[in-house]
Swiss-Prot record:
Biological source species: Schizosaccharomyces pombe (strain 972 / ATCC 24843)
InterPro entries given in the database record: Sfi1_dom
Main localization category: cytoplasm
Protein name: Protein sfi1
GO cellular component, one term: mitotic spindle pole body
Single biological process term from Gene Ontology: cell division
Chain segments annotated as transmembrane: none
Length: 840
C-alpha cells in the first residue's frame, strides 16, 4: 500500500485491486449503505447493529473481525458530509473512484464472466506472476526455462523492458504524488508563516499609532477625571458635613441602644447563670443520690463476692485437707505394710503369706469401712454447711441475681477452670510422689536382687514379693483414682445442682416479678379505663349542659333581636326628625352669623386701612432716620464678607495647588511607570517577533535542508538502484562469460588431450612396426642401400595437424566460441545454471 492508502499493484499503467481488498471494501460499503438509510447515521447503536448484521450475512464473526468497527469509528469521527460523499472521497483517495462512484454500485460483479473481464480484479496466479516479474533474477531464470528460440527471447525481453518502464513510470508517478503532497504541506506551512509575518508587520506598522491614540485618550480621560475629582471633592465635603451630623445623631441613638442592650445582656446573662446554677444543683443532687445508691450496691456486691470467695476457698481447703489426710494415711499404711511384710518374710515365708492375705483382707475391709464412714460424715457436714450457705446466699443475693447472673457465670467459669487446674496439679503431685516412691522401691529391690541373686530361692521369693507389691500398688492406684474420680464427680454434680438451683431461684423470682408486673399493668389499664369512662361521662354532661345553655341563649338572642329591631326603627325615626329640626335651626343660625360676619368684615377693613395709613407714615419717618445707619452697617458687612471670601479663595488656591502638585506627582509616577512598562512591552514584543522570525527561519531552513536531503537521498537511491542493476547485469554477464571461457578451455583441453593420446598411440604403434621392419630390413639394407626408406615420415611431427578430421573440429569450435561472445548473453543461458549475485 502507498502512503495515500491505495495499493501499488500496477498492470499496464493502471492500478488493480486484490480480491481481499475488494471484499473488505464491499463489506464497508454495505455497512455505510445501511447507515445512510438509518434515522441517526452517527449513533453508536445504529452503527453497531449495521456492523453486526452485515458481518453475519457475510459469514464473519463480529467479535473477531474488529478492523471494520475501528474504520467505522474513524470515519464517524471525521464525518462532515453524507455517507455517499464520504464513500466517494474514500474511493477517490485510494485511487479506485472508477470502480465504485456511489454507495449503490457494488464492487463485485453479478456473474463470473464479468469478473473475468473486469480489469480491476486480479486472480491469485496472475498476481503471483506479476509479483514475481518484479524481480530481475527470477524473471531471467523463467525466461531461460520457458523461452528457447531467439525471437521469443527478444520479444520477452522487449515486454520485460516495457513492463519495467511501466513500473518505473508508476513508481515515478507515486514519487511525484508524494512530492506534490509534500510541496502542498510545505506551501500550507509557508502560508501559515506568511500569515504570521503579515500579522507581525501589521502590528509593527499600526501599533505605535494605536499606542499614541491610546495615550491621547488616556490623557483626556485623566484630565476629565481630575476635573471630575475636584467636583467630587466639593460634593464630598458637603456630604461629609451632613454625614458627621448624622453620625452624631446615630452615635447618640447607638449609645442609647447599646446601653439598653448592655442591660438586657447582663440581665439575660444573670438569668442564664441562675438557670445553669439551678440545673447544676439539680444534677448534682441527682448525681449524689445515684452515686450513693451505686456505692451501696457496689458494697453489697463486693461483700457478696468476698463471702462467695471465702466460701469457695473454705470448701476447696476442706476438700484438699481431706484428700491430703487420705493420701498421708495411704502412704503411712503402705510404709507400714512394706516394713511388716519385710520382717515377717525374714521370719517365715508361709506364715508371712497367710498373714499378708489376712492383713490384706482385713485392711481392705477396714479401709473401705473407715473410708465410707468418713466420707458419709464429711458429706453430711458438707451438705449441712452448703445448705446453710445456700440459704444465706439466697437471702442476700436474690434481689440482685438477674443483674449479676452474667458476671457470676464468667466468675464461675474461671473458678471451674482454676479448680480443674488445681485438680490436675494435685494429680500431678500425687503421680510424682508415687513415681518417686516407686523409684525408691525399685532401687531397694535392685539392692535386694544384688544381695539375693545368688540363690534361686531368694530370686523366687523376690519375684513373689515383687508380684505382691505390684498387685498391692495397682490396687492402691485403683483406689486412689476411684476416690479422686468419685470426689471430682461429686463436686461437679454438687456444682451443677447448685447452678441449677440458682437458675431455678432466679427464674422463679423473675417469673414472679413478671407476673406481678403483668398484674400491675392490667390493674393500671383497668384504672385508666375507669378514669377515661368517668372523664367521658363528665364531658358528656358538660356538653349537654352547654347545649341547653346555647338553646336558652339563642331564644334570648331572638327576643333581643326583635326588641333591638323595634328600638332601631324608633331611633332612626327620632334621629331623622331631630336632624330635620336641627337643620332648620342651623340654617337660621348660619344666616344670622353670615350677616354679622359681613358687617364685621366691613368694619375691620375700614379699621385696617386707617391703621395702615398711620403705620406707613411712621415707617417713612423711621426709614428716613435709619437709612444712613443701615447703609453703614451693610458696607461694613460687605467689606468683612469680601475679606473672608478673599481669605477663603487664597486657602482654596493653596489647596488646589497642593492637590494639583500631588496629582501631577501621581500622574508623573504613573506615566513613568507606564512608560517603563510600555518600553518593556515593546522590547519584549520586538524580542518575541525576532524570536518567532528566527524560529520560522530555522524551520524554513530545516525544511529546505530536509527537502534537499530527501531529494539527494532519492537521487542517491535512484543512482544506487541503477548502479546496482547495472552492476548486477555486469556481474551476471561476467559470470556467464567466465563460465563459458572455462567450459571452452575445459573442452579444448579435453579435445587436445584426446588428440595427443590418439596421436601418441598411433606413433607408438608405428614406431614398433618401424622397429620391427627396420630389424628385418637391416639385413636387406645392404641389398637395397640405394633405395630410400618409405618409412621416413615416421618422425614427422606435422602429420597430426594434417588430419582434417580433427583439426577442422577444433578450429570450428574456437571460431564458434568467439562468435558466441559477440552474440547476446541469453543465447548461453541454456547451457548454464548461474548463481544469482549477492546484490546486498
Amino acid at each position: 500500500m502507498s502512503k495515500n492508502g491505495a495499493p501499488k499493484y500496477v498492470d499496464g499503467g493502471r492500478k488493480i485491486m486484490d480480491e481481499d481488498l475488494r471484499r473488505d471494501l464491499e463489506i464497508l460499503r454495505l455497512i455505510l449503505l445501511r447507515l445512510s438509510h438509518a434515522a441517526d447515521d452517527t449513533s453508536p447503536l445504529d452503527v453497531f447493529n449495521a456492523y453486526e448484521s452485515v458481518l453475519r450475512e457475510n459469514g464473519l464473526n463480529p467479535a473477531r473481525h474488529r478492523s471494520y468497527i475501528r474504520i467505522l469509528y474513524r470515519l464517524i469521527s471525521s464525518k462532515k458530509l453524507s455517507w455517499n460523499d464520504e464513500w466517494r472521497n474514500l474511493m477517490r483517495r485510494i485511487g479506485f473512484s472508477q470502480v465504485s462512484s456511489d454507495l449503490n454500485t457494488p464492487l463485485f460483479p453479478l456473474n463470473n464472466t464479468d469478473m473475468e473481464n473486469d480489469p480491476f480484479i486480479v486472480n491469485g496466479d496472475d498476481y503471483r506472476s506479476r509479483s514475481n516479474q518484479q524481480k530481475s533474477s527470477q524473471f531471467a531464470s523463467e525466461v531461460a526455462q520457458t523461452i528457447k528460440s531467439q525471437t521469443a527471447m527478444f520479444r520477452r525481453a522487449d515486454q520485460y523492458r516495457s513492463q519495467k518502464d511501466k513500473i518505473l513510470l508508476a513508481n515515478s508517478l507515486d514519487f511525484m504524488l508524494e512530492k506534490y503532497r509534500y510541496y502542498k504541506k510545505i506551501d500550507a506551512v509557508y502560508l501559515r508563516k506568511a500569515d504570521a509575518v503579515y500579522r507581525a508587520f501589521i502590528m509593527l506598522k499600526y501599533f505605535p499609532r494605536w499606542v499614541q491614540k491610546l495615550r491621547n485618550i488616556q490623557s483626556r480621560i485623566y484630565s476629565a477625571g481630575e476635573a471630575y475629582r475636584l467636583i467630587l471633592i466639593g460634593q464630598m465635603v458637603n456630604r461629609w458635613r451632613q454625614k458627621t451630623r448624622e453620625r452624631l445623631h446615630q452615635k447618640l441613638r447607638f449609645q442609647k441602644n447599646a446601653f439598653l442592650l448592655d442591660v438586657l445582656l447582663k440581665w439575660s446573662a444573670l438569668t442564664v447563670n441562675w438557670n445553669r446554677k439551678h440545673e447544676y444543683m439539680l444534677k448534682r443532687r441527682v448525681f449524689t443520690n445515684w452515686m450513693s445508691k451505686r456505692r451501696r450496691n457496689e458494697s453489697l456486691i463486693q461483700k457478696a463476692n468476698v463471702f462467695f470467695q471465702h466460701s469457695v476457698l473454705a470448701h476447696s481447703f476442706k476438700t484438699w485437707k481431706a484428700n491430703l489426710s487420705i493420701k498421708n494415711a495411704a502412704t503411712l499404711y503402705e510404709k507400714k505394710v512394706v516394713f511388716m511384710s519385710f520382717n515377717r518374710w525374714h521370719a517365715n515365708y508361709e506364715s508371712h503369706v497367710l498373714d499378708l492375705q489376712k492383713a490384706e483382707l482385713f485392711s481392705q475391709k477396714a479401709y473401705y469401712s473407715i473410708a465410707l464412714h468418713k466420707w458419709k460424715l464429711r458429706i453430711e457436714e458438707l451438705s449441712d454447711l452448703m445448705n446453710k450457705a445456700d440459704d444465706l446466699y439466697e437471702v442476700n443475693l436474690l434481689q440482685r441475681m438477674l443483674v449479676l447472673w452474667r458476671r457470676k457465670a464468667t466468675t464461675y467459669e474461671k473458678i471451674d477452670f482454676w479448680m480443674d487446674g488445681h485438680d490436675v496439679d494435685i494429680v500431678k503431685s500425687a503421680f510424682f510422689k508415687w513415681k518417686n516412691k516407686f523409684i525408691k522401691v525399685d532401687r531397694n529391690f535392685e539392692l535386694a536382687d544384688t544381695i539375693l541373686q545368688n540363690t534361686f530361692l531368694t530370686k523366687w521369693r523376690l519375684a513373689v514379693r515383687v508380684k505382691v507389691v505390684q498387685e498391692k500398688r495397682n490396687k492402691d492406684r485403683l483406689i486412689v483414682t476411684f476416690r479422686f474420680w468419685y470426689y471430682l464427680m461429686k463436686a461437679k454434680s454438687f456444682q451443677h445442682k447448685r447452678d441449677h438451683r440458682l437458675l431455678t431461684i432466679a427464674w422463679e423470682a423473675w417469673k414472679d416479678n413478671y407476673q406481678r408486673r403483668i398484674k400491675l399493668q392490667k390493674e393500671a389499664q383497668e384504672l385508666q379505663l375507669t378514669r377515661i369512662q368517668k372523664i367521658a361521662k363528665q364531658y358528656l354532661i358538660k356538653w349537654r349542659i352547654s347545649l341547653l345553655d346555647i338553646k336558652e341563649l339563642s331564644i334570648r338572642a331572638e327576643k333581643l333581636h326583635t326588641t333591638n329591631e323595634i328600638i332601631g326603627v324608633w331611633n332612626q325615626w327620632v334621629v331623622s326628625y331631630n336632624r330635620k329640626v336641627g337643620m332648620q335651626q342651623n340654617a337660621d343660625l348660619f344666616f344670622k352669623r353670615k350677616t354679622l360676619r359681613v358687617v364685621f368684615e366691613h368694619w375691620r377693613y375700614l379699621r385696617e386701612t386707617n391703621m395702615l395709613l398711620r403705620l406707613e407714615n411712621k415707617v417713612v419717618d423711621f426709614r428716613e432716620v435709619q437709612s444712613e445707619k443701615l447703609v453703614l452697617r451693610c458696607w461694613n458687612a460687605w467689606v468683612a464678607r469680601l475679606l473672608s471670601v478673599s481669605q477663603m479663595l487664597d486657602t482654596a488656591e493653596l489647596s488646589t495647588q497642593k492637590v494639583v502638585v500631588r496629582a501631577y506627582e501621581a500622574w508623573s509616577f504613573r506615566y513613568n511607570h507606564q512608560k517603563e512598562i510600555m518600553s518593556q512591552a515593546d522590547q519584549f514584543y520586538n524580542e518575541r517577533l525576532m524570536r518567532s522570525a528566527m524560529v520560522f527561519w530555522r524551520y524554513q531552513l530545516r525544511a529546505i535542508k530536509f527537502y534537499f536531503n530527501i531529494s539527494d537521498w532519492k537521487r542517491r537511491e535512484f543512482n544506487r538502484q541503477t548502479l546496482r542493476n547495472a552492476f548486477d547485469a555486469w556481474h551476471l554477464l561476467m559470470f556467464r562469460v567466465t563460465s563459458l571461457v572455462m567450459q571452452a578451455d575445459r573442452f579444448h583441453e579435453q579435445k587436445k588431450n584426446k588428440l595427443l593420446g590418439k596421436y601418441f598411440r598411433k606413433w607408438l604403434q608405428r614406431m614398433q612396426l618401424n622397429q620391427e621392419e627396420s630389424s628385418l630390413l637391416e639385413a636387406e639394407a645392404t641389398i637395397e642401400g640405394n633405395r630410400t626408406s618409405r618409412y621416413m615420415h615416421t618422425f614427422d611431427t606435422t602429420l597430426p595437424m594434417q588430419n582434417d578430421e580433427f583439426t577442422d573440429e577444433s578450429v570450428n569450435f574456437e571460431n564458434r566460441w568467439k562468435q558466441e561472445l559477440k552474440t547476446p548473453i541469453s543465447r548461453f543461458s541454456k547451457f548454464l545454471r548461474p548463481i544469482p549475485p549477492n546484490t546486498r
